[in-house]
Amino acid sequence: MFQVSLFLTLTVLTILALMTTLVLGVRVLIAGGVSKTNIRLVVSLKKAAFFCLALTFLNLGVVYVSQITASTPPINAENSIAELVKLDLNGRKQWISLRGHDKNKPVLLFLAGGPGGTQMAAVRHELSELEKHFVVVNWDQPGSGKSYYAEKTGNITAQTYIEDGHALTEYLKERFSQEKIYLIGESWGSALGIFLVSRYPESYHAMIGTGQMIDFAETERLDYAMALEIASKNGDDALIKKLRANGVPPYYGKDVTWKSAVYLNYLSRYMANHPGIQNPGYNTFRDVGSQEYGLLDKINYFRGIINTFNHVYQQLYTIDLRKDYAKLDVPVYFFMGRYDINAPTVLVEEYGRILDAPEKGIVWFEHSGHSPWINERDKFVREVISCFLED
């Protein structure tokens, strides 16, 4: 957080210096420009301009240093691995973290939610126990976090993630000399995981979906209706008015993020205050302040959630796993929070009934909402080990 504090301090000083420079510049112009009687004012203007320029370059230097010194904390074990790696995946520069107590353990790729979300630091904080049993890989997908500039936002599609996810899988298989890897997908990442195991079943042992997305358009309609229902019970008239003004989703255009946020944030707050949910909410400030992210990455942490989500999410409304992915050749398990009202569990149960897979199952987390991996992390780790390593 020292870098953040320094950056903010320098930014404030730069703004003050710029304002001083502008004020002095206006005074010089009013006084008739450079003249012998105005020389002291001109000298002050030059000093202010130089100071402003120096602060700007100093701040840029702080940003640059923060980017090149970003790292993931070491793991103190003889055969451990703890690295941030920049990869070229289909011509797009992207970042992953690799963490494990033994680099010979099975590889587990965690697919973050979003699109546009990064959980590189969050997974390290919440699921460090998994690092004793796997080489845990976190991938900042195109348009998120450290990989925000991997592709122009306007060019990103679901196919982009599928292609790059496959390329990343091939890299991991080759680097760690493993024929297959394991997948965990969270929220949007759970749908991406289904896409990957469907298209490339030979590359994956098994997959776990948590906060599983099934039908994106129906999910938005159900979430909207749930928010209206809760708001009506609570007498939240202002929210009801805003929801009705926005209309029933799905939304399209430039305001998808902001319109969706009205009911999604409301549902998140509801789950965060639910007495049946353990360890509720998200530790966003802890995560964005983590050392994996440089200052520019920290800014892009939020840009991905806003810009990438807005562009990509509206492309997903035609996807319904029940129709398009009813048969898979890889074992699939669903880790569901009993109180998840973000990804409606009724859709997951329906998909689970019709899904044809070598093995399938639903694991309920009785004290969780949309994020069992945060709400009940100890049980989450135990169930991952049970599904992946003990069968």
Task: Outline where the language-model segments fall.
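Alpha/beta-hydrolase
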Residues: 237-323, 330
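Conserved alpha/beta-hydrolase
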Residues: 131-148
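Glycine-rich "HGGG/HGxG" loop immediately N-terminal to the catalytic nucleophile
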Residues: 120-121, 143-156
